[in-house]
Design a protein with these regions (language model features):
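Generic C-terminus detector
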Residues: 226, 252, 543, 556-558, ...
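Glycine-rich oxoanion-binding loops at beta->alpha junctions
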Residues: 66, 70-83, 274-287, 311-347, ...
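Conserved short alpha-helical segments that host acidic/polar catalytic motifs at enzyme active sites
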Residues: 1-250, 254, 258-297, 306, ...
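Glycine-rich, anion-gripping cofactor-binding loops and their flanking helix/strand elements
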Residues: 179-201, 329-363, 504-538, 568-582, ...
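Acidic/histidine-rich
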Residues: 155-186, 458, 463-489, 531
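Glycine-rich phosphate-binding loops that contact phosphosugars or nucleotide phosphates
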Residues: 291-432, 437-440, 522-559, 584
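Active-site phosphate/pyrophosphate-binding segments
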Residues: 259-263, 267-297, 387-516, 589-609
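Short acidic loop-to-helix transition motifs that present clustered carboxylates
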Residues: 128, 154, 196, 325-334, ...
Length: 609
């Protein structure tokens, strides 16, 4: 995690660094710092908490100068304190480093450096980078960084500034993102384009193992042997307005309401329902190749994985192919049975989640074909996959993923139909029927959102509870999992999800009047079974909040609270049913006074193991 910004130019570096760090706060927000070359010395400012605290400190204690580096932290090694905040210095205090990622061999290096006389001031792994560069620095910062790179193990990106080498900053990318922005007499470095988009749209994406030197007039990228490389400059065509709140109290609420529009973007141009045709050339997989796969493995983390669980149901239903879905962090270490007859689908909003990236690489190493379902364009995973399905959900800022989830599920619907068609399991008419309904889903969700005020009353009634159980079956079991994840991550209420039929095998022991049960009980093949499960809860004095299909009056007999959703087919119901659960979590968290967009201990992009 963590966010990095670097600036070399003619404007006040502190202003640019602070503005950039605010845009990167989604990557971590437990402490932050900047270092600016002020005359011939380095002005270092570090504060615990969000960027606004650092901003106050810089206002009180200005750091004037036109060259600097900055960092927003999500703690891995060492608590979130001012002395653990970046930038970190070497012994001389003349060299500063910011870093995103983990240095796996930092203890070994720290011992070696301590023995040779270096003294450390923090509990971080980052500080070894500063001391290692110091130990190799014989007057050429670039060379010292290259030698240091050769000693570090792990996945990371870092940027270095040395007051004795006052016209440049140097960076290296080794697994975590680092991009450079080209300006006129000023140049930028950052973890993400959003940090520097107000200044430039011309971006260079670094590859792993590349070392970068940034001066006011030029950006030079080197390979690990310090041979200069020719790098392509990409022009960014989206803007930051898409990443602002547009009058909503929180990004999460805005993003929930954006779902009709994002789904329209995800689906747009990808099918013709009247002809029952899909246009998915971007998968980079011919119909013949797709038809030959014997199994599919879906790997992802968190919400992205839950979309994958829905994908498993859909792929098995429509394409009749065996599918497993697993946590990327488990998959990468469990010796999975995959080979060149396996299609591995990796799902990620950010496209840079460390476990998902590593799982994808492992799958490729074993000969599988990889397909990414990704939101962030040109992200690490997107660039390495054999084929990419971009979900086009736009920037998602709220740490709790909402619009990316429904867009990922929509991607799975299209991919499952496509596979069903090329494998001869679905006729053109069948595909056309599902697509015709899919086309209506954005307006179905709009209608659902217009009538969603009642969810605030439900939230009010349950905001003080300490535990929740979520139940669902079939394709809506993942909906229950996603609902529970949303609630726990932003409201800090303990919430767990179970397949409704599994409840009687253990969790039923938890049921009493203090633990509300949220049941997804929309019309489906297992509707009657879910009703029985709800009755089992009621028989034990449980309180039940039911997500039910509009017009289902029967449910009033069983439910304490009902949230109605429009009727849609079972296969597409996860797209609709999750929306009230997102809203329920949002309103409960808001009523509890939680930081909805930046919940404690989390970060939007998890680039560490
Ligand atoms: C979502 O609400 C979570 N914050 C988290 O589970 C997230 O979905 C997960 O970390 C995966 O992120 P990715 O989609 O960017 O790979």
């Amino acid at each position: 995690m963590c966010g990095i910004v670097g600036y070399v130019g003619h404007q006040e570096a502190a202003d640019i660094l602070l503005e950039g760090l605010k845009k990167l706060e989604y990557r971590g927000y437990d402490s932050a710092g900047i270092a600016v070359l002020q005359g011939e010395a380095i002005a270092l400012r570090r504060e615990v908490g969000k960027i606004r605290n650092l901003e106050r400190e810089v206002l009180a204690n200005p750091a004037a100068g036109t060259l600097g580096i900055g960092h927003t932290r999500w703690a891995t090694h060492g608590r979130p304190t001012a002395y653990n905040a970046h930038p970190h210095t070497d012994c001389s205090g003349k060299l500063v480093v910011v870093h995103n990622g983990i240095i796996e061999n930092y203890l070994e290096l720290k011992n070696e450096l301590t023995e040779s006389g270096h003294s450390f001031n923090s509990e971080t792994d980052t500080e070894v980078i500063a001391h290692l560069i110091e130990s190799y620095n014989e007057g050429d910062l670039l060379l010292a960084v290259q030698k240091t790179y050769g000693r570090l193990r792990g996945t990371y990106a870092c940027v270095v500034l040395d007051q004795r080498d006052p016209d440049r900053i140097v960076g290296v990318k080794a697994g975590n993102p680092l991009i450079a922005g080209l300006g006129d007499g000023e140049q930028f470095l950052a973890s993400d384009v959003a940090a520097i988009l107000s200044y430039t749209r011309d971006i260079i994406y670094l590859e792993d193992g590349e070392i970068i030197e940034v001066t006011r007039d030029a950006i030079t990228v080197y390979d690990p042997d310090l041979r200069p490389k020719n790098k392509e400059v990409s022009r960014i065509d989206w803007n930051l307005v898409a990443a602002e709140k547009a009058g909503y109290e929180h990004f999460m609420l805005k993003e929930i309401h954006e779902q009709p529009a994002t789904l329209t973007n995800t689906l747009g141009g990808r099918f013709d329902d009247r002809q029952g045709k899909l246009f998915l050339d971007e998968l980079n997989l011919s119909a013949e190749t797709l038809a030959k796969f014997e199994r599919i493995s879906i790997v992802a983390c968190g919400t992205a994985l839950y979309s994958g669980y829905v994908g498993k149901y859909l792929l098995e239903e429509f394409a009749r192919i065996p599918v497993d879905a697993d946590f990327a962090s488990e998959f990468r270490y469990r010796n999975p049975v995959i080979d060149d007859r396996t299609l591995v689908i990796v799902v990620s909003q950010s496209g840079e989640t460390a476990d998902t990236l590593a799982a994808m690489r492992e799958a490729k190493r074993r000969g599988a074909t990889t397909l990414g379902i990704i939101n962030v364009k040109d992200s690490a995973i997107a660039r390495e996959c054999d084929g990419v399905f971009y979900i086009h959900a736009g920037p998602e800022i709220g740490v709790a993923s909402t619009k990316a989830y429904t867009a990922m599920v929509a991607a799975f619907v299209l991919i499952a139909l496509h596979l069903g068609q090329v494998r001869g399991k679905l006729s053109t008419v069948q595909v056309g029927e599902v697509l015709a309904e899919l086309k209506t889903i954005p307006s179905v969700i709009s209608r659902m959102l217009e009538g969603a005020d009642h969810i605030q009353d439900v939230a009010q009634a349950f905001a003080a509870c300490r535990d929740f159980l979520f139940l669902g079956r079939g394709v809506n079991f993942p909906t229950a999992m996603e609902g529970a994840l949303k609630l726990k991550e932003i409201s800090y209420i303990h919430a767990e999800a179970y397949a409704a039929g599994e409840m009687k095998h253990g969790p039923i022991a938890l049921i009493d009047e203090h633990m509300p049960v949220v049941a997804v009980a929309t019309k489906s093949a297992t509707y009657d079974k879910v009703l029985s499960n709800i009755q089992e809860v009621k028989a034990r004095n449980g309180t039940v909040i039911v997500v039910a299909t509009e017009g289902d009056l029967n449910i009033t007999e069983y439910a304490d609270q009902i949230i109605y959703v429009p009727a849609v087919s079972e296969a597409l119901s996860p797209l609709v049913n999750v929306v009230p659960l997102q809203l329920l979590a949002y309103h409960i968290a808001r009523l509890r006074g939680c930081d909805v967009d930046q919940p404690r201990n989390l970060a939007k992009s998890v680039t560490v193991e």
